[in-house]
UniProtKB/Swiss-Prot annotation:
Function: May regulate phosphatase activity of protein phosphatase 1 (PP1) complexes.
LRR-type repeats, residues: 30-51, 52-73, 74-95, 96-117, 118-139, 148-169, 170-191
Subcellular location: Cytoplasm, Cytoskeleton; Cytoplasm, Cytoskeleton, Microtubule organizing center, Centrosome
Disulfide bridge positions per record: none
GO cellular component: centrosome; cytoplasm; manchette; microtubule cytoskeleton; microtubule organizing center
GO MF, one annotated term: tubulin binding
InterPro entries listed in its UniProt record: Leu-rich_rpt (IPR001611), LRR_dom_sf (IPR032675), SDS22/Internalin_LRR (IPR050836)
Source species: Danio rerio
Designated name of the protein: Protein phosphatase 1 regulatory subunit 42
Keyword set, alphabetical order: Cytoplasm, Cytoskeleton, Leucine-rich repeat, Repeat
Residue span(s) of domain LRRCT: 205-243
Length: 329
């Protein structure tokens, strides 16, 4: 097992020969950048002497657990992509961390980020997920990042919705290509809350094939500069925004007119019910509705008496059930 230790740093590090007056311990205390990428490292040992470390490169290794970083209170950049990490943990003391790279691991839930009050970039693309599973997001972690996170990469994670990310209102860049996003209305709702969004990559998602997909997102994301790798022309954006505003303005009066007509009909029906069918105003309105127009032929009125058959087969006139029928000819 290859472990990252101070001895390995001494062996492979760049302790300058010209600094012979400086001890190795002093060198470690002053160290700010440490690059041990692609060294087959499986575990991080105690590096607490490197108290001023700000950038740590550990990508392309065999690390299975994030550990022993509690000393690195000054760390701002952590690169641990392409390892065997399955859980985001032990990062609570990294209060200055602004960029975290964890792509290409085996993480199933984005969690354990509640104490990262300075995190601006999070990269968790291309996780090695079990068949049929998608990357999930812990609400507490997402809520804690709502005022700081600007750049998020969640591409290639079988994600089919973005509701959980709605609180991230400081977002400027979202990379979510090669997922299973399909609901254009959901995306419009989420992105309408991200007023600072400048770059959006949803390429190779099912939603890209929806009618007017590009037009709808450009309209709702009013400051978007780049969509799916294509620049957005300012004139085109303004045209789409104006077109939507005009369409909405025309729709409102029609909706209002329909609503007024519906209310009037309801009031008329209600009034007739309370007045009763024999009220003069009701009879007048009823007769006006049945009156033929000038272009119609006058009706011929027939009186028919309901014939009631007696037990002998003969008909008797029922005066009490006299009906009137009108026939147009």
């Amino acid at each position: 097992m290859v472990r990252l230790t101070v001895h390995l740093i001494a062996k492979l590090g760049s302790h300058s020969k010209s600094s012979r007056s400086e001890s190795f311990q002093q060198y470690l205390r002053k160290l700010t950048h440490l690059n041990f990428s692609d060294k087959n490292i499986e575990e991080i040992d105690d590096l607490s002497v490197c108290r001023n470390l700000t950038v740590l490169y550990l990508y392309d290794n065999q690390i299975s657990q994030i550990c022993n970083l509690g000393f690195a209170s000054n760390l701002t950049h952590l690169y641990m992509q392409n390892n065997n990490i399955s859980c985001i943990e032990n990062l609570s003391s990294l209060h200055k961390l602004s960029k975290l790279f964890l792509g290409g691991n085996s993480i199933t839930v984005v969690e354990g980020l509640e104490e990262l009050k300075s995190l601006k970039e999070l990269h968790v693309e291309g996780q090695k997920l079990p068949c049929g599973e998608k990357l999930a997001f812990d609400p507490h972690s997402i809520s804690s990042l709502s005022e700081t996170l600007c750049i998020l990469n969640i591409s290639k994670n079988n994600i089919d919705e973005l509701w959980d990310l709605a609180p991230l209102r400081k977002m400027t860049h979202l990379f979510a290509a090669d997922n299973q996003l399909h609901d254009i209305q959901e995306l419009e709702t989420v992105f309408s809350q991200w007023f600072k969004l400048r770059l959006l990559d949803l390429s190779r998602n099912p939603v890209c094939h929806k009618p007017k997909y590009r037009d709808r997102l450009i309209t709702v994301c009013k400051f978007l500069d780049d969509l799916d790798g294509k620049q957005i022309n300012e004139l085109s954006r303004q045209f789409l925004i104006n077109w939507k505003a005009s369409k909405d303005a025309k729709k409102k009066p029609e909706d209002g007119k329909d609503n007024k007509l519906q209310v009037a009909n309801q009031l008329s029906t209600s009034a007739d019910f309370h007045l009763g069918p024999q009220h003069p105003s009701v009879r007048e309105r009823s007769s006006s509705l049945s009156k033929p127009s000038e272009n119609e032929k006058p009706g011929v009125t027939f009186r028919t008496d309901q014939i009631q058959a007696d037990s002998r087969g003969r008909g008797t006139r029922g005066d009490s059930s006299t009906e009137w029928q009108s026939l147009k000819i």
